[in-house]
Amino acid sequence: MIRTVVLLLLGNLWFTANAQSDVSPTGSTDSLSSKYTLENCITEFSMDKIVKTDAGYQFWFVDKDFIDGRTLKMSVVAPHQATHAPHVHAEDEFFFILEGRAEVFLQGEWKSVGPYTSFYCPSNVEHGIRNPGDKELKYLVIKKYQK
């Protein structure tokens, strides 16, 4: 129950944060009603659509081409692995740990965190995430790519 509520709140917060950008100057959303339908606004997880990585896999719930560069991705990292080394990029990111333990890195420091923990990474700041545990690490990443 808590997981469902948290995920609904995350999704609602993320998608409504920029909702006004899709409204025309007259306040009309007619073009949106034809662009966004139940067929393309619902994404169910499927192992057939995962993207394998060296450390596990990723699943894109929302691709950057769907809505103005915003994405929602789930990453699954095998025990004692990291998707990549700490790095820097122009986009900020918001991580939300679903399952397992994570070690998160920000500006030279590591911290161990568990499920239902968020981790915000500002743009152009070195950051990273890895799985120090014996079980899979599963987390969501919300990111908005630059145009």
Regions found by a protein language model. Give the residues of each.
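Sec-dependent N-terminal signal peptides
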Residues: T4-L13
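A short, N-terminal "cap"/entry segment at the start of jelly-roll beta-barrel domains
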Residues: A19-R70
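Short histidine-centered beta-strand/loop micro-motifs
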Residues: V62-K64, T83-V88, R130-P132
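Conserved short histidine dyad/triad with adjacent acidic residue
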Residues: K73-H89
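Short beta-strand segments in beta-sandwich/barrel cores
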Residues: A82-H84, G100-F105
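Glycine- and acidic-residue-biased ligand/ion/polar-headgroup-sensing regions
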Residues: E91-D92, F96-A102
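Short acidic-glycine-tyrosine-enriched beta hairpin
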Residues: E109-S123
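Ligand-binding loop in jelly-roll beta-barrel domains
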Residues: S123-K147
